[in-house]
Amino acid sequence: KIAILGRNGAGKSTLLQMLAGMRIAQQGQVLLDNISIGQLDPADLRRDMGLLSQTGRLFFGSLRENLTMGMPEASDEDIERALTLSGALPFVQKQKNGLNYMIQEGGFGLSGGQRQTLLLARLLISQPNIVLLDEPSASLDEMAEAYLIEQLKQWIGHRTLIIATHRTAMLQLVDRIIVMDQGRIVMDGAKEAILREQGEPTA
């Protein structure tokens, strides 16, 4: 369980995209179970790994279609579990059409928090073993963020979790911190040690 910290433009999002196989490293290589990520079948990667990026989008179509993109066989139980985890279930329950509620292109008309929790639910439906989250609580208020943290604590188990975040509360989910600056890793260590060095209260 790792947090990636750094200022805007430090390279956090780029690193997550490289880990997800969406960008190719110009130097060095990304290894997954000691195998170069470039040698792995992209279909296997997509099945085992989920990335919530800042550029993720909702499209014109029903809630169900948006949530099951890439997982058309997902059951209503799978969908409800993911919605509960992300915190989006109350929003869906308020819609009289439920999962048939129509989403506008880009999620137009939804709040930033609603879009974010729906995109997170889309990722969680597939129950990936490796979870990459880029600022997952950036659009959430403190209450929604606290709910998400508690849900992820219970769900994450033995999965690999890597979070890029500016929000101190999210550090409750990790035991290791990597600090980036201008595309380079400048600190890497146990959470408590890094926070002490940074002068932050331990989470």
Language-model regions: role of each:
Residues E142-M143:
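Helix N-cap at the start of a conserved alpha-helix in ABC-type nucleotide-binding domains
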Residues L5-R7:
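The feature captures the beta-strand-to-loop junction immediately N-terminal to the Walker
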Residues V131-D134:
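Catalytic Walker B motif of ABC-type/P-loop ATPase nucleotide-binding domains
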